[in-house]
Amino acid sequence: MLKKWIPSEPVIHIDDSDVVKPDGYKFESLGIVRDGSESTSSKNVYKKGYHVTEACVLTGNNHPVSIFSRIHSSAEKDYKSANTITFDAIEQGTTLFRKATFAMDRGYDDNKMFLKLDELGQEYVIRLTAKRKLLYHNKWTPATELRDRRKGKIKTSVFYKGKDHEAYLSHVKVQITASRKNIYLVLVYGITEHPMMLATNKEIKSKEDVIKVARTYFSRWKIEEYFRCKKQMFQFENFRVRKLCAINALNFYITLCMAFLAMISMESESNALKVAIIKTADPVKEKVFFCYYRLAKGISGILSYAKEGVRLWFRTKRPAYRQLCLKLVA
């Protein structure tokens, strides 16, 4: 069923989040994680909790559906590394879709990541850090130097942090440190203080291809919103079970609920069920880019009327009338 929802060229976003349990003591393999909700660009806040690695594929209407979700901790007995979990997520995406485009943030600017994606024959759009060096004209050159030499010549609009922005794009052919394979460095000017640097092995033949690469990366805000929706609408961090296996089981059930929201979101606007759900949610805005919140609120509102469960909502099928038959033995 999932493949029916996905376009012919799948885009998979991989990102890490956290589940913090600052007052927890008895949870299994409880480690220390960076609290993303309280940390800023200038200050990191660390608390007790777990790491969450998620891989989401975008549906035909650009809503995320999870294909991989795992809660893990560096305090586990046989824990290897966060990269091992990320590789599992990439392999899961490769198994489901023979070829896809993986979009990742700066935390995945790692030679091992590029080599893994090349090994599996996958395409990628990965944002580079300021420390990255690239081979340009047979000379190792800092990516920041290539960025500062150029100016964006391609004008386009992109959606970033809840707003539409005008961006100016440029691209240059380079080689990555890991595999020495030819890739493109796509530069995005006019949005952040320092222009963004995106590495991609996707083929670029026109300015439309450059715009497509940039928009593929900027669509990753949806996986960030996906995490927020899980935490707010399903109280993701408010679990009470202690075993890591049980925590992952609860995470699996939430993932199924989020997939159901994705299924409802793809229905037409005239669909009776979708209309009833949105009407119950009573949203402030008529249209939004991310509709999971209102769908979850609407379904919760409908189910709140079920005081004795939903079993009584269905008409019971009575068995066929059977006449009492007595067999007399002579």
Predicted regions located by residue number:
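Single, function-defining residue in the core of a domain
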Residues: 6-10, 21, 25, 58-330
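Active-site-proximal, Lys/Arg-enriched surface segment
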Residues: 1-60, 170-173
